[in-house]
């Protein structure tokens, strides 16, 4: 792992899997030592080799078209939770599982849907324990829908269309919050997901 020396003082804002999308004022992290990258590390091996930052030092995370490339997404989210301050915000942008964008890229290893993000919270593990020890509460999922295909439809009609037709959602954005201390894995602690639909 390679860590830059000019990270400033915490709390940090961490741009995870930044690639060439360098964000000014953020700590930019990627698996490749590209210009502007502050921390180089392998996002697939975070259970064995954690990110070289102290616990509870990051209050904002950005993962823009990253998580769909990661085989061990639970390991990634667990490591980010370690770094998160209580109440830290993570914004995850991904292709919707019902779009060609989710499947055409051979480097994508899994598809995501609005309810997928609940599996990064503890209450979703009331039935089974996979060793995941983190708790991210999905606050809102925004579906950016094809403006032409959804013209004249109300939000419920659009949402129904996203459930049964392909390529309606161009992009999905999930906003999650780090819950610390971690909640118990109890079904009754699950909360309803707020879904926002916006034209793209």
Locate the predicted segments by residue.
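S-adenosyl-L-methionine-dependent methyltransferase catalytic module, highlighting the catalytic core
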Residues: 74-75, 79-81, 85, 89-200
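Conserved alpha-helix/loop element of class I SAM-dependent methyltransferases that forms part
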Residues: 1-12
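Intrinsic-disorder/low-complexity coil detector
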Residues: 9-10, 34, 180, 198
